[in-house]
Amino acid sequence: MNLIEQLEQEEIARLGKTIPEFAPGDTVVVQVKVKEGNRERLQAYEGVVIAKRNRGLNSGFTVRKISSGEGVERTFQTYSPLVASIEVKRRGDVRRAKLYYLRERSGKSARIKEKLVRKEKPVVAA
């Protein structure tokens, strides 16, 4: 590990943010800090993760949602002070790292199957 990577790891540890494991295709709710005048509030932004960029401290992800019939995408920096929290609502079952093809789709064809997590049964010795 070189010096720059080490400094980035120390900075991530100093921030103390707990970022859940999520991947493209997952539906997430991002709580964003919004400043209006002199007060600050949290705004929820829920949508499908269509891209994720893992670059240490410079990591980011893009969330797409349909708002009033119009597609809206927003890119967030994972360790930004404006991102208060990230919550995973459901896991998506996709075979791509970047889901940019969802931009051309609408309605049912833009939906993503849910990933079903199997619980392993304990093996009983006979």
Curated annotation (Swiss-Prot):
GO terms for cellular component: cytosolic large ribosomal subunit. GO terms for biological process: translation. Keywords: Ribonucleoprotein, Ribosomal protein. The keyword Ribonucleoprotein applies. GO terms for molecular function: structural constituent of ribosome. The keyword Ribosomal protein applies. InterPro entries: Ribosomal_bL19, Ribosomal_bL19_CS, Ribosomal_bL19_sf, Translation_prot_SH3-like_sf. This protein is located at the 30S-50S ribosomal subunit interface and may play a role in the structure and function of the aminoacyl-tRNA binding site. Belongs to the bacterial ribosomal protein bL19 family. HAMAP family: Ribosomal_bL19 (MF_00402). This is Large ribosomal subunit protein bL19. It comes from Dechloromonas aromatica (strain RCB).
